[in-house]
Regions:
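Glycine-rich phosphate-binding loop and adjacent beta-alpha segment
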Residues: 223-289, 324-328
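Glycine-rich beta-strand-centered segment in the early N-terminal region that forms part
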Residues: 23-39, 50-90
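Glycine-rich NAD(P) Rossmann-fold beta1-alpha1 loop
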Residues: 128-129, 154-161, 221
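Residue-level marker of beta-strand positions
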Residues: 64, 81-82, 101, 149, ...
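NAD(P)H dinucleotide-binding glycine-rich loop of Rossmann-like/cofactor-binding domains
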Residues: 86-151
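Adenosine-nucleotide cofactor-binding segment
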Residues: 168-224, 281
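Short, glycine/polar-rich helix-capping loops at beta-to-alpha or helix-loop-helix junctions
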Residues: 98, 179-186, 247-253
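C-terminal hydrophobic helical "lid"/dimerization subdomain
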Residues: 274-328
């Protein structure tokens, strides 16, 4: 079978499509025929060697994939069953989805919900799954459509744009924050009530500003997150899942101790299985068919290295899917 294999030579990461034997696959109780995978930012860092993502070589990248069970030694899965996988260190320290087959632990897999195709699952991918977890965090924090307006930062990205669509589908009034004015019309099509320029949130202000938002999903971090915290309603919840703008948090405790604001971290990598299943079930039912018509490009395994480099150079728009095996 074919796989994109990363090897290291003289400190450089080399990526090429190789033929490997099924016996070379890592340990696991379920073998999956991979239909679709994707090129995420973390994949791009791994494939190009620009980030210290991979510490053990050789490695097959691909942090998410969707496909069909080929063989199972676990009672929860049967041959022919469609499945999806995100996270768990797959594609980082366990061979991932950029191969015609993947062998993984059964408790890492989620049965593909009815109504969702493998291709649609990978249009959503890790970003869509993370967005759903963020929405669930707001709900668990008591934020409802009646609570008031909610805001999403980094709305042009995969997590942010999906969060806008999900919140709109659930009846929330959504404001999107974006640094790309050319995406404003697209964000409004997804359901954003208004789109604000990221620059409005990039400068430090007072410890407490006028209360504007009942809830927030932040994918940016740093000053944008700090500014949002100063603008939250009393008792509001902020779900933070990203660091596109940096890892710092130049904030004060004032929003927490005077406005009872809750800052909820959201991690998608180690999310327990039951919560994963609930998130994917809701993703399959909430989003309209038009969501899956968004800008995507489909590539082959051989095109993955060049595409990874282009993604890091901001030359890629939309989601990149890798057609690995049989496609729907």
């Amino acid at each position: 079978m074919r796989a994109l294999v990363l090897r290291q030579q003289d400190g450089l990461t080399l990526a090429d499509v190789s033929t490997i034997e099924p016996s070379q696959l890592p340990d696991g109780d379920v073998t999956v025929d991979v239909d679709w995978s994707g090129i995420n930012y973390k994949d791009a860092l791994a494939i190009t060697g620009k980030g210290k993502i991979i510490r053990q070589f050789p490695m097959v990248p691909g942090i998410d994939f969707a496909g069909t069970v080929h063989h199972s030694d676990h009672p929860d899965f049967q041959a022919g069953q469609p499945v999806v996988l995100t996270g768990w260190g797959v594609g980082e320290n366990h061979w991932g989805g950029l191969a015609e087959q993947a062998r993984v632990r059964a408790d890492w897999l989620v049965p593909l919900p009815q109504g969702l195709t493998p291709r649609q699952a990978m249009i959503l991918g890790t970003a869509g799954f993370t967005a759903m977890l963020c929405v669930m965090a707001l709900e668990e924090g008591g934020v409802t459509p009646a609570s008031g307006e909610v805001v999403v930062s980094g709305a042009s990205g995969g997590v942010g744009s999906t969060a806008v669509a999900l919140l709109h589908a659930l009846g929330y009034q959504v404001t999107a924050i974006s640094g790309r004015a050319d995406n404003n019309a697209y964000l409004q099509q997804l359901g954003a009530h208004q789109v604000l320029d990221r620059k409005e949130f990039a400068t430090a202000g007072r410890p407490l500003e006028k209360q504007r938002w009942a809830g927030a999903i932040d994918t940016v971090g740093d000053q944008v997150l700090a500014t949002l915290l100063t603008q939250m309603h009393y008792g509001a919840t902020v779900a933070a899942c990203g660091l596109a703008g940096g890892v710092s948090l130049p904030a004060t405790v004032m929003p927490f101790i005077l406005r009872n604001v809750r800052l909820q971290g959201v991690d998608s990598v180690m999310t327990p299985r039951a919560r994963r299943q609930e998130a994917w079930r809701r993703l399959a039912t909430l989003l309209p068919a038009s969501f899956y018509e968004q800008v995507t490009q489909e590539i082959t395994l051989e095109q993955a290295p060049a595409t990874a480099a282009a993604l890091l150079e901001n030359r890629i728009t939309g989601r990149t899917l890798v057609r690995v095996g049989a496609a729907d």
